[in-house]
Amino acid sequence: MSNPIHQNRRALGATEVVTQLSKLNGEQALGWRLIDGALEKTFEFKNFHATIGFVNVVAYIANAENHHPDLAVSYSRCTVRFNTHDVNGISVSDFFCASKVDALLA
């Protein structure tokens, strides 16, 4: 069964995005950013093994939520990028999944 947060998706307006981004980042200076119509954050790790472990858990979350980010992976970094293609913008689903990804490292 799909998560109810993903039902009736719509693109959020600019004010809603800014409000949600502020809530998501909290006190973090280098948290999620709005880049070219998507939520984006780069995570850093001590080595490739740790990076790939993170990628695998993000993949599990994405599959469970049926909401898949773009990932850019290098030796000690992974950039996660969420937007909702079917609404051509950022939706509540993006913020929901971004918060789940953040919780991995909390």
Cite the ranges covered by each PLM segment.
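Charge-rich alpha-helical segments
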Residues: 1-106
